[in-house]
């Protein structure tokens, strides 16, 4: 009689684990399919940043209380860094803050940096091309 009970527990347990693994696989497949679709649509930077930080651009903007970066300007980055420093210090665990909130603030900054920096670099490259190449010539006396 005990062997029947043990066998039944093993069978039911394996069914539960099998279903859990199947569900986890479905979720992972759907997530990777979504990321591939994002990259195909031209949101490659968005997809990469979302993968690394696990946060959307809207969520990052809400956490740091900044507007969405329309164009990658230094002013946007300065505002992001200002808000980041203030919120990071306010949520310091040694001062009674929350480590979880502090990590969310860090992830939000990383997400916004991933969005703004490529635009800033592109702008700088365009400005350099516009100005032309001006080598520095050193004259001896």
Curated annotation (Swiss-Prot):
Say which domain of life the source belongs to.
Eukaryota
Q: Which GO terms describe its biological process?
A: protein import into mitochondrial matrix
Topological type in the membrane:
Peripheral membrane protein
* One MF term in the entry's GO annotations: protein domain specific binding
Give the keywords, sorted. Answer: Membrane, Mitochondrion, Mitochondrion inner membrane, Protein transport, Translocation, Transport
**Domains as described in the record:** The J-like region, although related to the J domain does not stimulate ATPase activity of mtHSP70. It nevertheless mediates the heterodimerization with the J domain of PAM18 and is therefore essential for PAM complex function.
**Name of the protein described by the UniProt record:** Mitochondrial import inner membrane translocase subunit tim16
One Pfam family per UniProt:
Pam16
Enumerate the InterPro entries for this protein.
J_dom_sf, Tim16
Keyword Membrane annotated: yes
Q: Give the organism, scientific name.
A: Neurospora crassa (strain ATCC 24698 / 74-OR23-1A / CBS 708.71 / DSM 1257 / FGSC 987)
The organism's taxonomy opens as: Eukaryota, Fungi, Dikarya, Ascomycota, Pezizomycotina
* Membership in a protein family: Belongs to the TIM16/PAM16 family.
Region J-like: start and end of each range?
Answer: 59-117
Q: Subunit composition?
A: Heterodimer with tim14/pam18. Component of the PAM complex, at least composed of hsp70-5/ssc1, grpe/mge1, tim44, un-4/pam16, pam17 and tim14/pam18.
Query: What PANTHER family does UniProt report for this protein, alphabetically?
Result: MITOCHONDRIA ASSOCIATED GRANULOCYTE MACROPHAGE CSF SIGNALING MOLECULE, MITOCHONDRIAL IMPORT INNER MEMBRANE TRANSLOCASE SUBUNIT TIM16
Q: Which GO terms describe its cellular component?
A: PAM complex, Tim23 associated import motor; TIM23 mitochondrial import inner membrane translocase complex
Function of the protein: Essential component of the PAM complex, a complex required for the translocation of transit peptide-containing proteins from the inner membrane into the mitochondrial matrix in an ATP-dependent manner. In the complex, it is required to regulate activity of mtHSP70 (hsp70-5) via its interaction with tim14/pam18. May act by positioning tim14/pam18 in juxtaposition to mtHSP70 at the translocon to maximize ATPase stimulation.
Q: Where in the cell is it found?
A: Mitochondrion inner membrane
The segment annotated Disordered runs over 119-141
Its chief place of residence is mitochondrion
């Amino acid at each position: 009689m005990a062997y029947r009970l043990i066998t039944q527990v093993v069978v039911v347990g394996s069914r539960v684990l099998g279903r859990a693994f199947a569900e986890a696989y479905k979720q992972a497949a759907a997530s990777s399919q979504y990321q591939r679709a994002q990259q195909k649509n031209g949101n490659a930077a968005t997809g990469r940043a979302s993968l690394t930080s696990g946060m959307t651009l809207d969520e990052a903007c809400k956490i740091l209380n900044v507007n969405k970066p329309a164009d990658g300007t230094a002013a946007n980055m300065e505002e992001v860094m200002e808000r980041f420093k203030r919120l990071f210090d306010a949520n310091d665990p040694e001062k009674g803050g929350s480590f979880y909130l502090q990590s969310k603030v860090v992830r939000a900054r990383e997400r916004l940096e991933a969005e703004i920096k490529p635009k800033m670099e592109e702008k700088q490259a365009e400005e350099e091309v516009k100005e032309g190449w001006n080598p520095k010539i050193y004259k001896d006396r």
